[in-house]
Swiss-Prot record:
Reaction equations catalysed: N-succinyl-(2S,6S)-2,6-diaminopimelate + H2O = (2S,6S)-2,6-diaminopimelate + succinate
PROSITE patterns: ARGE_DAPE_CPG2_2
Keyword Hydrolase assigned: yes
Listed pathway(s): Amino-acid biosynthesis; L-lysine biosynthesis via DAP pathway; LL-2,6-diaminopimelate from (S)-tetrahydrodipicolinate (succinylase route): step 3/3
Organism: Pelagibacter ubique (strain HTCC1062)
Protein name: Succinyl-diaminopimelate desuccinylase
Residues reported in the UniProt entry to bind Zn(2+) 1: 73, 106, 169
PANTHER family found in the cross-reference section: ACETYLORNITHINE DEACETYLASE, N-ACETYL-L-CITRULLINE DEACETYLASE
Classification via InterPro entries: ArgE/DapE_CS, Bact_exopeptidase_dim_dom, DapE_proteobac, Peptidase_M20, Peptidase_M20_dimer, Peptidase_M20A
């Protein structure tokens, strides 16, 4: 059995320009590496009529319970203007004790650390009292419809039991060891269209200005105090992100007015309860103004919380032991693929420092990368 190194493996993964939904061969490459350790690998390609096909990987070492799964993604965001980078984004380079390259931080390096941790564990332990698995997607940075969500459905169909999942997203704001994610807020995006009657500005009685209703609605929903937050979650928050009347003439009352907004919500609400509350406001105001509305909602995920258990506290203790920092159990930040995995297993998230994710010259500290491998190795040792 070969011995792998996290820096070398991270570099190899970064060299693949796997910009969502392009695979560029990275999933097959990782599967080959895992096969040498003893994993049975299955590359799963999913597609949708409105989206391009995406490759995913499920790999398992062992065939008994408990099954400890690591989840992550090998797709990356586009590098943007390459001229702004000090290196070629997919030519990983070490400078000033940092590994630079697109995906170094989010999240190819964490995957490399996990693979090396498993490799080391297998080399020093002839028998695993259970199974180790990986769920790696190529659709986390995109629309996320042909990725983890469908792999989870596949695992449910195959009756594959997952006892615990560690998601390797970059969870730490500033220093390695600061934060473990034990849940995430839900997210709703909405596009609201108010339908009025177009007309001449000099004859408002012959028209119905939709912007009047839109302004009233936006004012009302922005003033809503949804809740005060909970012990584990921030207060629910609504932000208006776009207002568009799309009227190029100064002497025309528009026929349509649109706005988009996002709600990040805690576990005091569901997407359905929030939509019902908002729809009542839309109906009330448009009825009074004699206008009409239509609204399209897109729910990225529901709020969820993994109640801390002995595995959570074990991982917290391991991180503290290696980093000398006791990590906070948090639910802050955006959505992640944990929102899909939590349907089949308790899960938490811990990875690198997220300062440079999606940025020009995305980078990870070499010291942090090595420490993360130690943390993952200790987690395996303590879990089994």
């Amino acid at each position: 059995m070969p011995t792998y190194n996290e820096i070398t493996l991270a570099k190899e993964l970064i060299r693949f320009p796997s910009i969502t939904p392009i695979d560029a061969g990275v999933m097959k490459f990782l599967a080959k590496k895992l096969t040498t350790i003893g994993f049975k690998c299955k590359i799963l390609e999913f597609k949708d009529k409105n989206s391009k096909p995406v490759k995913n990987l499920y790999a398992r070492l062992g065939n008994t319970q408990p099954n400890f799964m690591f989840a992550g993604h090998l797709d990356v965001v586009p590098p943007g203007n390459i001229q702004d980078w000090t290196i070629k984004p997919f030519s990983p380079t070490i400078k000033k004790n940092h590994l630079i390259g697109r995906g170094a931080n989010d999240m190819k390096s964490a995957i490399a650390s996990w693979v090396v941790a498993v490799n080391n564990y297998v080399l020093t332990n002839k028998k695993i009292n259970g199974s180790i698995s990986l769920l790696i997607t190529g659709d986390e940075e995109g629309v996320a419809i042909n990725g983890t969500k469908k792999v989870v459905d596949y695992l449910k169909k195959k009756k594959e039991k997952i006892d615990f999942c560690l998601v390797g997203e970059p969870t730490n704001p500033n220093k390695l060891g600061e934060m473990i994610k034990i849940g995430r807020r839900g997210s709703i995006n909405a596009e609201l269209t108010i339908i009025g009657t177009q007309g001449h500005v000099a004859y408002p009685h012959r028209a119905k200005n939709p912007s009047t209703s839109l302004i009233k609605i936006l004012n009302e929903i922005k003033e809503i105090k949804f809740d005060k937050g909970t012990k584990d979650f921030q207060p629910t928050n609504l932000e208006v992100t776009k207002i568009n009347i799309n009227n190029t003439a100064d002497n025309v009352i528009p026929g349509l007015a649109r706005a988009t907004f996002n709600i990040r919500f805690n576990n005091k609400h569901t997407s359905s309860s929030l939509k019902n509350r908002l729809n009542k406001i839309f109906k009330k105001i448009t009825k009074k103004d004699k206008s009409n509305f239509k609204v399209e909602y897109r729910v990225s995920g529901e709020a969820f919380l993994t109640k801390p258990n002995k595995t959570t506290y074990m991982i917290q203790d391991v991180i503290k032991k290696i980093t000398k920092i006791k990590p906070q159990l948090s639910t802050t930040g955006g959505t992640s693929d944990a929102r899909f995995i939590r349907k089949i297993a308790p899960c938490l998230e811990f990875g690198l420092v997220g300062k440079t994710m999606h940025k020009v010259d995305e980078a990870v500290s070499i010291s942090d990368l090595k420490k993360l491998t130690k943390i993952y190795s200790e987690i395996l040792k303590n879990y089994f």
